[in-house]
Amino acid sequence: TRTIPVKKYVRIGHSHFRDASEYFRGLQALCDSGADFVDGVVFGPGDFYLTTGTFVDDAPFLSDYTFEHIYYRSIRERSADYLTTHDFLWRWDTDWFWCSKNFGVQNPLLRRLAGKARLNSRTYTKVMRWNSRLKLTQRLGALFGVRHESVIQDVDIPIERAAEFLDFF
């Protein structure tokens, strides 16, 4: 752990991997490298991304994932990106990682109808609590004979066993 000076912008770089063992070796190397930020996303088998973030004073362009554009999609679309430091820290919140699809607000029309102010984890949490009380999705599922249960689980896996866990999972 180290403290580093904050700058106005963050340069983001995304690297794609197809092999889990190479991906986790790359993750370990980046963590050991002293990068300002390291992030990893597994979209599915053979579709792994490592993201590095580096504080910079200037940005040749800025992306905005606070309303119409969706951050997690940009990972596959761009090898490099720039955000303000504030937007970098909150990059996952607009779409509650990728859970916004469960509310239909990845649809551009519904996204505009919801409005920028409602696209955040606070709103999604309120909707989830409301749904839990009213059991709306359970009732719809029962009506159509569909049962769906959401499970979100964080696990701590030693990096040297991570590829093995991913194969199991």
Where are these predicted regions, by residue range?
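Noncatalytic alpha-helical scaffold of FAD-dependent oxidoreductases
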Residues: 1-169
